[in-house]
Amino acid sequence: PIFIGEWGFPTFATTDTIIEGNLGQLKYRELYIRTAEVFDRMGVGSIKAWFLGNRSMQNFLYGGPSTWSIFNDSTDVGTAERKYITDVISRPFPQTIAGDIQSFLFNHATRTLDLNIKPDNTKGASKIFIGANRHYPDGFSILINNDFVMYYNPLKNVGIETYKAPKGANPSDFIWDEKSQKLIVLKWPFDKEELVIKVVPGIRNFN
């Protein structure tokens, strides 16, 4: 396994107040998205430095005062996010998979998580971080091999609902954990077979 520690470009003081330009939030967000895509395609884990924030800025690079903090509060322990950073690093991803991950990628433009796995149910449960409150306030749909389809409606307090399921699949094995914003899979429907999984925005957003 490969783990990337403390990656990322420092945030300049001006970045919090401007959208365009080399130090603007759009350019900054694009840089982080492209970096996150590389990590996803490589299948590596990563962390972002200074999660708790830093009140003081320093001159790390040419461009003026900057900080590594992902929060912009004036306190040490921040809660006001720099969302042009946090919305990227907190993207959906397969946190724990019982079996082998073949590939995964979150597309920020379409808000689609593509995940290919070869499950092994003898290894326990799987967890996929969705972050619905951030990325899917309009709900999301889960497609497995296109013949097992479920969805989550944030306006209803019923968890994951099933649109269609193949023979032998048990929808009750799929549990939505609202507190952790994770999809917990107790058992995959097709053990030791390659599965093509998609998480897409919207309720019943499928053909």
Residue ranges and their predicted role:
Residues 101-102, 147-190:
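Extracellular/luminal ectodomains and secreted, surface-exposed scaffolds of diverse proteins
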Residues 1-10, 44-50:
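Structural recognition of the beta-strand scaffold that forms the well-ordered cores
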Residues 14-145, 181-206:
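Aromatic-rich peripheral "rim/lid" segments of glycoside hydrolase catalytic domains that contact
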